[in-house]
Amino acid sequence: VICVKIDKPRQIVLRLDDDDDSTLSVFADALETDIPDPNGEKTVLIDAGSCEPINGGDYPSGTLFYVTPGFHDVPRLLLMSNQQLYIAPGAVLNSRVRVDECQENVKIFGRGILRDYNDTRAFNSNTDERFYYLLTLGNSWDEGKICRNVEVKDIILLDPTSFSIVFLGAQDCLVDNVKVIAGEISTDGFSFWGNTKRITITNSYLHVTDN
């Protein structure tokens, strides 16, 4: 029995039996203060029946995608300007998520888990060539196609089979209190490519096999 006593929000990892691959991760977050309304006018619920890809371009500006508790398969999820993705506590979203090029003011948050939909490093028929990684912010090497002002907060990224979080032409972004746990080879934690600038990362934890 392992008992952990915590008197404030903390991220604690216990290394067991002197083995880097045997760890117990304890993520004790503060209480949520920014829980969105699941019944909001522009809220789209992702529930147990969700199994199709989601293209934010099919939804209006201001849409909130609300992932309810439970396990949900959404092979790929594309976010556009002024959209939000909320992953509730107890929710596991099996997906790959991208904020598209030229988009801005996007928020990804919640206390749930984003887990890689791909079960191998190779791409499968449920992804396309633009969803290479678990979470991608931006999608262009072109300086004129920058993704801006994206916030990623509080979520857990689990079991990526490729790079974990990739910034590809992203600027003025914030990553706060994000936890990444990976065991696959070459699951880089943060990758900064293209014209990526002014990225702030705070209070975050990485257990990956690179970077």
Give the location of each predicted region.
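Extracellular/periplasmic carbohydrate-active domains that bind, remodel
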Residues: 1-211
